Amino acid sequence: MRRSRLATLALSMAASIGVALSLGAAPAQASPSDRYVALGDSYASGVGADSYTSESGNCLRSTNAYPALYNANIRPASYRSVACSGATTADVINSQLSALSSTTTLVSVTIGGNDVGFANIMSTCVLQGESQCVAAVDAAMNVARTQMPGRLANVYNGIRNRAPSARVVVVGYPVFYQLGTVCVGLTATSRAKINEGINLLDDITRTAATSAGFTFADVRSIFVGHQLCSYGTKWLHALNVLNLTVSYHPTAAGQSGGYYPVFRSAAG
């Protein structure tokens, strides 16, 4: 999420607000000879997981992010992450696809949340009322339905054109809230609506990935019990007024316990 959009959250009181794979193509076996490139936004760069590399600057790439964990455990022949906090589908096309080549054999990408305005939605839902929150999510869902299939197709076509032989794994987003628990902060209606919006984006992304012949790695199931408002160990940051950038992003445990095993399975 973009830091500028989250900055308004500092006006709010800090409150606790509270795997399965869809296969377009069967994942091949991981190989030490793989040449792996990671694309995407803050969920791929590892915002919220700490241990950011100095070279990544404002992109905030973490050594605890799922692409870095894959590199550390599988040891592909080469690895490069160009995932960047705040990235949109346009940013992937304009600034990240150049990292791919005909020798790339594995690509991961998590993208779309900034296109539909994750950060703006959470700002609205925290700072305003239930009706404004629901309206913000409805507007984002309209963008998801009308704009995201085409935007995602453009990204996926760009990946295939630049890396024609690569296995491509499209990794989705976790649903933020566990429902039906006692939880302060947002209303139950707002939490359910936010979940509805995330589910829609994931479903649209899965369809687009499958149509492109890519593998969709769905992290929603594995995060159940670790969401905001759950009684288990949280794998997502709630609102953090001392470090707004990490709000609603996976923790290091969320990357290692949630994202990494799902991606590892999908990658082969």
Segments (PLM) and residue ranges:
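Secretory targeting and sorting signals
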Residues: 1-30
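Serine-esterase "nucleophile elbow" of acetyl-processing enzymes
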Residues: 30-83
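Oxyanion-hole/transition-state-stabilizing segment in secreted/luminal serine hydrolases
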Residues: 47, 91-144
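Short, flexible, mixed-charge acidic loops at enzyme active sites
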Residues: 51-52, 119-131, 183, 228-239
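Structural recognition of the beta-strand scaffold that forms the well-ordered cores
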Residues: 35-40, 44-46, 78-83, 105-110, ...
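Short amphipathic alpha-helices and their capping/turn segments at secondary-structure boundaries
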Residues: 26-37, 92-109, 153-165, 263-267
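A structural motif corresponding to the C-terminal end of an alpha-helix
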Residues: 69-77, 150-167, 200-217
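Catalytic His-Asp segment of secreted/periplasmic serine-dependent ester chemistry enzymes
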Residues: 174-268
